[in-house]
UniProtKB/Swiss-Prot annotation:
InterPro entries: Gal_mutarotase_sf_dom, GH-type_carb-bd, Glucan_biosyn_MdoD, Glucan_biosyn_MdoG/MdoD, Glucan_biosyn_MdoG_C, Ig-like_fold, Ig_E-set, TAT_signal. Pfam families: MdoG (PF04349). It comes from the Bacteria. Residues 1-32 form the signal peptide. Keywords: Periplasm, Signal. This is Glucans biosynthesis protein D.
């Protein structure tokens, strides 16, 4: 497994993997698509043509690593790269009357070495023209780029694209596709956070992880006044090709993406990840090990939320473990899942650089039957916030063999809150700390005599108020150890209930402890299910060290 080290930020997700052989696969046509910056020959294009291209490409050998960049681009620093600006006067839809959306392209350079081809499509005639790279599309400012090295490099291509929405045209983008098959979007805060990918391959296997590339995009010319646009993408890698259609709705408070893909396997694939997403979790209310900074919490997402095919809602708080962890949650035709950032309180982060309280959640809603499979969650140890250490995706149960073809349809919601909510009580927060004493009576003279770990899980909403007089019962299941000192506490400031228990080990094992809990009233579940993974310390660390100096 290749533990990717992508640098966080819109300019810092380096692309890896193969080039595309699409040049020989285009059909010929005689008419032009309408775009002032498109300068290539006309060719007919629609989604069925793209599917045929991806299918035919899968029958050919993958072309391997990208070709070298001109020296002036290959040696760029991140600061120099970020100073390059696309000329807004030459944006893709600059001349569309009453345009509400516009698109610009990212320059090649630094870690972005894979050429991405761009095409403008007239949706009325289905005719496309390529947009070739030329230096006059960009403003180089203080980047120190030797533009003479770029003259005549019309096949250099671009690194990706981003889309702007009125009234912030050319100022604040709302959608970005940059690096391999990574893409992101924002909600009404305009703050980027976690990323999605076109596909994940061998994320957690004994093989090196493979990162497919989007190697070409086709943009339907946006309609006047429209806030929805359609872009098509060709995906290519050593093991698979794919045709993608993104219908992207840039709404006032969220971005919604309707995604349809058709995939064609070149090789057998051990682990195929559908609708993958990548996030960061360094520390939070439940995981304090790496919180030795001025910030109480540091994370893009605080939980994995799952709405299972059987209707069960699950909340799985994220971790920053000391050792890489991968968990797979079995399901059949899942209703939805996502990495959520539900804590939106600035005081819980105190971060005026990262603005983690403004980062969007990402929810996946399958639009066709996905069948049996698992939702995979990988958590990688990190010492800070510059590593995306959380990966989540859907893995079909059926093994992928060379020559297989399959299609998935799903909707992505980039928003502060997911589009659907558990009607039962929901987990608001998870906290852990020292146990072994009555709540409110942490001894000041000495530590508790017996070591234990306390867990406090806050539930809000649902029918908790109605259930309280009848009796609320926490149902706790542990893979090892035992739960004691179980308490149910009403928390007035949140108008919810805290379930608190102490975990005591029953062996010397340091294997992760899988915890499961939900609330029940008169035999009926009244909350979503809380899942947690705790990593007990070694036996010789299960003691409290009194380091006070009393004299």
């Amino acid at each position: 497994m290749d533990r990717r080290r992508f640098i966080k930020g819109s300019m810092a997700m380096a692309a890896v993997c193969g080039t595309s052989g699409i040049a020989s696969l285009f059909s010929q046509a005689a008419f032009a698509a309408d775009s002032d910056i498109a300068d290539g020959q006309t060719q007919r294009f629609d989604f069925s043509i793209l599917q045929s291209m991806a299918h035919d490409l899968a029958q050919t050998a993958w072309h391997g690593a990208p070709r070298p960049l001109p020296d002036t681009l290959a040696t760029m620093t991140p600061q120099a790269y970020n100073s390059i600006q696309y000329d807004a006067e030459k944006s893709l839809w600059h001349n569309v009357e009453n345009r509400q959306l516009d698109a610009q392209f990212f320059h090649m350079g630094m870690g972005f070495r894979r050429r991405v081809r761009m095409f403008s499509v007239d949706p009325a005639t289905h005719l496309a023209r390529e947009i070739h790279f030329r230096p006059e599309l960009f403003k180089y400012n203080d980047a120190g780029v030797d533009t003479k090295q770029l003259e005549g490099q019309s096949d250099l291509g671009f690194a990706g694209f981003r889309v702007f929405k009125a009234p912030e045209l050319a100022r604040r983008d709302v959608v970005s596709f940059l690096g391999a098959s990574y893409f992101r979007a924002v909600d009404d805060t305009y703050q980027y956070g976690l990323s999605a990918r076109g596909l994940a391959i061998d994320t957690y296997t004994d093989s090196k992880e493979e990162f497919p590339d989007f190697t070409a995009f086709w943009f339907d010319t946006v309609k006047p006044g429209a806030t929805t646009f359609t872009v098509y993408a060709l995906l290519d890698s050593a093991s698979i090709t794919g045709a993608y259609k993104f219908t992207i709705h840039c709404e006032k408070s969220q971005v919604i993406m309707d995604v349809e893909n058709h995939l064609y396997a070149r090789k057998d694939i051990k682990q195929l990840g559908i609708a993958p997403m990548t996030s960061m979790f360094s520390c939070g209310t439940n995981e304090r090990r790496m919180c030795d900074t001025i910030h109480p919490q540091i994370h893009d997402s605080d939980r994995l939320s799952m709405w299972r095919g059987n209707g069960e809602w699950i909340c799985r708080p994220l971790n920053n473990p000391q050792k890489l962890q991968f968990n797979a949650y079995t399901d059949n035709n899942p209703k939805g899942f996502g990495l959520l950032q539900l804590d939106r309180d600035f005081s819980h982060y105190q971060d005026i650089m990262g603005w983690y309280n403004k980062r969007p959640s990402l929810w996946v809603e399958p639009r066709n039957k996905w069948g049996k499979g698992t939702i995979g969650l990988m958590e990688i140890p990190t010492t800070g916030e510059t590593l995306d250490n959380i990966v989540c995706f859907w893995q079909p149960e059926k093994a992928v063999k060379a020559g297989d073809e399959f299609a998935f349809q799903y909707r992505l919601y980039w928003s502060a809150q997911p589009p659907v909510h558990c009607p039962l009580a929901r987990v608001m927060a998870t906290r852990t700390g020292m146990g072994g004493f009555p709540e409110g009576w942490a001894p000041g003279e000495h530590y508790p005599e017996k070591w234990a770990r306390r867990f406090a899980v806050d539930f809000v909403g649902g029918d908790l108020k109605a259930a309280a007089p009848k009796g609320i019962e926490p149902v706790i299941t542990l893979s090892s150890g035992e739960a004691k000192q179980i308490e149910i506490l009403y928390i007035e400031p949140i108008d919810g209930y805290r379930i608190q228990f102490d975990w005591y080990p029953t062996s010397d094992s340091t294997d992760p402890v899988d915890m499961r809990m939900y609330l029940r009233c008169q035999g009926d579940a009244i909350s979503e299910t809380w899942l947690y993974q705790y990593f007990p310390p070694a036996p010789d660390k299960r003691q409290y060290v009194d380091d006070r100096v009393m004299s």
